[in-house]
From Swiss-Prot:
The keyword Transferase applies. This is Ribosomal RNA small subunit methyltransferase H. Belongs to the methyltransferase superfamily. RsmH family. One of its GO terms (biological process) is rRNA base methylation.
């Protein structure tokens, strides 16, 4: 696992947002290479605790090694953060002082050919974050009805050529199963007219994103995990979420906004009858993005958006 690498995005901004303190309990729901976790544990010394979650077994192994210096202050759990509230209840945690979610696919996952996330190298068409369970991208590509493939590619990839891509996939798999990343890339390139390829975007980008989201149920996990984490925040506790595409950011933005919304009664009513009071306040009205120096050092940070909320 020594070659596992992942540069945490917006590290200073996350640390400033959470302002970890000794004695606090913090959650990293997307542990990855443990970059954010290490910073939080260091800042919350000597008594701050962190519970880290990840569904990638390789990431878990690396995080255990990298965070071993913090001893009993850290606990690592191999689990998708969608079920985070239940997982924390099982270990007796009923309140937290802060959480971070970094929703990006790690550099390690993208760069390891055998994981099947990248359209730049040939590999088995997998894309599972947790390779011990669930259907792979190849399973979806070779078994889903054309209409469902179209829905996934259109909705999750926001691909304008989704209908043609889905049609071409079905035609290709009728001849033989699509089993590798580059086999799928060839199908996509055939479906999208070359004259319509975007200058700075590989033609397979949106379809690969869509399949990755579908394989890992990323949006559903985000909705469930976010609500669970918000429900556990103590007064004054903060949540920080880093998203990388518009679908994720929309869920985070709307989730935070709903939590920070008070009375929803029609304006014509003289008094409030709904009884709704805001439970949170938005720390960031607009998302925080990476500066020029960080983007230069880590190009993947270019699309990162950080939103922060506080329990009141």
């Amino acid at each position: 696992m020594e070659d596992f690498h992942h540069i945490s995005v917006l590290p200073d901004e996350v640390l400033q947002a959470l302002s970890p303190k000794s004695g606090g309990v913090y959650v990293d729901g997307t542990l990855g290479g443990a970059g954010h976790a290490g910073l939080i544990l260091t800042a919350s010394a000597p008594e701050g605790r962190l519970i880290g979650f990840d569904r990638d077994e390789e990431a878990i192994a690396v995080a255990r090694q990298r965070l071993s210096v913090f001893g009993g202050r850290v606990r690592i759990i191999h689990r998708n953060f969608a079920g985070i509230a239940q997982a924390l209840a099982e270990i007796g945690v009923d309140g937290i002082d802060g959480f971070v979610l970094d929703l990006g696919v790690s550099s390690h996952q993208l760069d390891r050919d055998e994981r099947g996330f990248s359209f730049m190298h040939d590999a088995p068409l997998d894309m599972r974050m947790d390779r011990s369970s669930g259907q792979s991208a190849a399973d979806l590509v070779n078994t889903l009805p054309e209409a469902e493939l179209y829905r996934i590619i259109s909705e999750y990839g926001e691909e304008r050529w989704a209908k043609r891509v889905a049609s071409f996939i079905v035609k290709a798999r009728d001849e033989r199963p699509i089993e590798t990343t580059l086999e799928l890339v060839d199908v996509i390139k055939g479906a999208i007219p070359k004259a319509k390829w975007e200058e700075r975007l590989h033609p397979a980008t949106r379809t690969f994103q869509a399949l990755r989201i579908a394989v890992n149920e990323e949006l559903k996990s985000l909705e469930e995990g976010l609500q669970g984490l918000l429900s556990l925040l103590k007064q004054g506790g903060r949540g920080a979420v880093i998203s990388f595409h518009s679908l994720e950011d929309r869920i985070v933005k709307e989730g935070f906004r709903a939590a920070a919304t008070g009375c929803t009664c029609p304006k014509e009513l003289p008094i409030c009858v709904c009884g709704r009071v805001p439970r949170f306040k938005l720390v960031t009205r607009k998302p925080i993005t990476a500066g020029e120096s960080e983007v230069a050092a880590n190009p993947r940070s270019r699309s990162a958006k950080l939103r922060v909320v506080e329990k009141i």
